[in-house]
């Protein structure tokens, strides 16, 4: 199943098959793809929260790059641990995106 996930780019997509989700640059382990405007950040927020986080928690996430603490994760792990996913609303999500460099320094994230 192809899932259109605009945000990082307008044509971003993820591939969901069986118990696997290939996320490209949309979702990484503990991180997400970058955006360059509020509008794109909102699209990304909707893609992540309404589309990807609605998948079963045991779904294995295979990002396009290994930028996290592990090369793979699960939807459940991302719901519990990804700082972007656990934000309570879009404004908090956007604040984190705009202050990601400082957040990484404060939390020892590379």
PLM-predicted stretches and their roles:
Residues 43-110:
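Accessory terminal helices/loops
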Residues 1-58, 62-63, 92:
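Catalytic core of the metallo-beta-lactamase
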């Amino acid at each position: 199943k192809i899932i259109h996930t605009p945000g990082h780019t307008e044509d971003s997509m993820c591939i969901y098959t069986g118990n696997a989700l290939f996320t490209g640059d949309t979702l990484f382990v503990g991180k997400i793809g970058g955006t360059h405007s509020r509008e794109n950040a909102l699209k990304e927020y909707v893609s992540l929260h309404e589309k990807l986080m609605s998948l079963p928690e045991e779904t294995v996430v295979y990002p396009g790059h290994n930028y996290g603490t592990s090369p793979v994760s699960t939807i459940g792990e991302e719901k519990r641990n990804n700082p972007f996913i656990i934000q309570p609303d879009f404004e908090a999500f956007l604040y984190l995106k705009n202050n990601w460099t400082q957040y990484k320094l404060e939390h020892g994230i590379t």
